[in-house]
């Protein structure tokens, strides 16, 4: 073909890969393995440009590693459960299963049209029984170990949708979808004991050398380990007490009040006889409990009749119900020191609560104005009785000893992270394999009865899950006693499925959760996904991996060796979204320019970690470059088809210069490949093509060598055109299984070099000189040059500064 027909070229290449199972991975202990994985998508129905960029990054890495001779695993699957499928099913009057499977089929064809090197023989969809059977089995093992449990928990309850909402789904006190006023409701929920692994999850962050520092910091903060004291405040005229955790026991003598959560048992008890307090608690139930919102929303409180006794001074301390205290954190109570905590200060200002300063600056110079703000730094204790004059460290130890000796406190290590709530009151999810028996209590399903299948013959409505209304699902015999019992109707949070899919790819058809292949492939060598998953998904996957390790299923401690967090795709400076009307349909681009152009632009426009700004001219530019590559191959077809090798003894001056530039760019490309700086690798390809086009009278052998190197560097980015041209020229059948080029150090040895000549720091001329010249010979050549003689004339040379093979500066006066 004389013209670049991308449609024909891409169809031919994809057909070849299909017929030859080019991407199928097979365990081979004689080869170094490389497991490359992009985060699996939710099957929404169509690909967007974010998908294209994410999977192109992964494909470039996978193809490059394969050309390095490694045994590459590059799988793909579908995160197929979740509420969006229910919503779509209701809207389109289809079952979630039908809707999901239809979307998967279409999106798979879109991925194939982009030439991604996925091993589809390992495809998993989390809604398939063959997948979720094993997470049900695993849950039962965790339940038997006491790592999975059920307890009552306060949740955001949507009375219209009849389901629990995450904090993020509550907007201005209303359900994000139904618009109903949200209620705080206590219902039974299932949890995994991630807190049992909090220390290890925190410690092992230090092992993650291949992760971005930003992600590691986010996980460290989310786990939130803090060491402090738990202090006991006795309730006056009662045998009850309130326990509070503090990391600042040095401020204990400055406590002005205690704050308790609206759901605290003491608050609920008093509300029985106090209608105003009950109204306040009801109001608190309608506000967001997200930490970000708690930090900014108005601080509100209600003074109770309860009084506590200070554990050291013996003074009485008022107890307030406060909207910023969460029952789910610590004991649901805090000690408030308005003089030394800004949040407590704001609350005290609003309700005219007295401040007591107990810390002064260490330098004795800083002036404090507690009428304006709290003094929150550590310093020296004052107004603290026997503890006066102590610094933070000494005060911590002294107060700890006092509390311990008098049974009024103890040292505690607290974590910000709390056990993972894994149950959802929705239909489209993996059934939790537990049974409720009146006689036996909670009983796991027998393993031989797994999977507990999700019924597909359901009628979905907008209100809650239909599982409780399906008798054949709900009613079962107790596995223990055989008496009538009922199934659990909650389903797993979809994070449960996405926390172990990477491991199932290693043995997708195994008749057990994981087989020995898992330890060949794991850990994942390169994991690619958005930084928005830094905490939830990536932390849960790390937790799950440790659970699987302790079950004897894997031997490694961590799931992902290296993590690449790609930036967003922007248009007009904003993230692409349908609501903004700034989306670009990848399919339209593929139809207009071809998959290789779309792939090339997405890699060239910005480094992977940075956001990519969409540019129509950038896409045109990528397409023009590929046409130049094709035209060079077509124009030089007969030359490139020759089976010739380089004879370095017969190279012309231009040949040597061209080879130097080609190999210098190859060397840079290899360095940038290993750093995942793909935009500069593409730039190196463009420079190599320019070199081949710009030098006159290049020998056929140099043209062939240079173009062969170009195609191999470019192949991971634009596999279709490179596959086609590799075959057309006769270089081989399959470029994917060709060795990536290596640097010829001899080619990088210059016969000549370009010397910049300066006089008094100003550039005057540039001279080409023999690379073998010594410093003295270089000076001699420069000073004998006619142009230089003209510039110097009769001036006196003070000194000569020489930077070898780069620059010479002649200082004259």
Swiss-Prot record:
Catalytic activity: tRNA(Leu) + L-leucine + ATP = L-leucyl-tRNA(Leu) + AMP + diphosphate
Localisation: Cytoplasm
Enzyme class: ligase
PROSITE patterns: AA_TRNA_LIGASE_I
Chain ranges passing through the membrane: none
InterPro entries: aa-tRNA-synth_I_CS (IPR001412), aa-tRNA-synth_Ia (IPR002300), Leu-tRNA-ligase (IPR002302), Leu_tRNA-synth_edit (IPR025709), M/V/L/I-tRNA-synth_anticd-bd (IPR013155), Methionyl/Leucyl_tRNA_Synth (IPR015413), Rossmann-like_a/b/a_fold (IPR014729), tRNAsynth_Ia_anticodon-bd (IPR009080)
Gene Ontology molecular functions: aminoacyl-tRNA deacylase activity; ATP binding; leucine-tRNA ligase activity
Binding sites annotated in the UniProt record for ATP: 578
EC number: 6.1.1.4
Pfam family, one: tRNA-synt_1_2
Chain span(s) of sequence motif 'KMSKS' region: 575-579
One BP term from GO: leucyl-tRNA aminoacylation
This protein's name: Leucine--tRNA ligase
Organism whose genome encodes this protein: Francisella philomiragia subsp. philomiragia (strain ATCC 25017 / CCUG 19701 / FSC 153 / O#319-036)
The gene coding this protein: leuS
